[in-house]
C-alpha cells in the first residue's frame, strides 16, 4: 500500500477527477511505491522512524503520479493555429518517473555518475 493516497494527488491537482481517473491514480500510486521500494528496501523502517521522511515520501509519490495523470501524452508544447504539438521525450511513453532531486530527498544518490581516470605514468629507469 502506497504512503500517498489518491486524495493527496487530488489535493495537489486542485480539481476533481473522473472516477476512472481516480482508479488510475490508485494503480499508479501502487506502481510508484514498488519503484521506490526497489531502490530503498528498508522504506517502511525509514518512514516509521521519521515523520519528515514520511511527509517527503508522500509528497514525492503524489507529485510523480500527478505529473503523469496531468499530462499522460507527454505534451511539451501545443499550438492552435496550423496545429502543431511537441512531445516531451521522457514523458511521451506514459511512464512514471521520480526526478533525481526527489531521489536525493529520499536519501538515494543519483544514478548519474562521473569518473575521472588519472594515469599513473612511471618513467623508465
From Swiss-Prot:
InterPro entries, alphabetized: Mycophage_D29_Gp19
Pfam families the UniProt entry points to: Phage_Gp19 (PF09355)
Record's protein name: Gene 19 protein
Biological source species: Mycobacterium phage L5 (Mycobacteriophage L5)
Gene name of this polypeptide: 19
Amino acid at each position: 500500500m502506497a504512503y500517498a493516497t489518491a486524495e493527496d494527488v487530488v489535493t495537489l491537482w486542485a480539481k476533481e477527477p473522473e472516477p476512472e481517473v481516480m482508479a488510475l491514480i490508485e494503480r499508479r500510486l501502487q506502481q510508484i511505491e514498488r519503484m521506490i521500494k526497489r531502490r530503498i528496501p528498508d522504506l517502511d523502517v525509514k518512514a516509521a522512524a521519521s515523520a519528515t521522511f514520511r511527509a517527503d515520501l508522500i509528497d514525492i509519490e503524489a507529485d510523480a503520479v500527478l505529473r503523469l495523470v496531468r499530462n499522460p501524452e507527454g505534451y511539451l508544447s501545443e499550438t492552435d493555429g496550423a496545429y502543431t504539438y511537441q512531445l516531451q521525450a521522457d514523458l511521451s511513453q506514459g511512464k512514471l518517473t521520480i526526478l533525481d532531486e526527489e531521489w536525493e530527498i529520499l536519501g538515494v544518490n543519483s544514478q548519474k555518475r562521473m569518473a575521472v581516470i588519472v594515469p599513473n605514468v612511471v618513467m623508465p629507469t
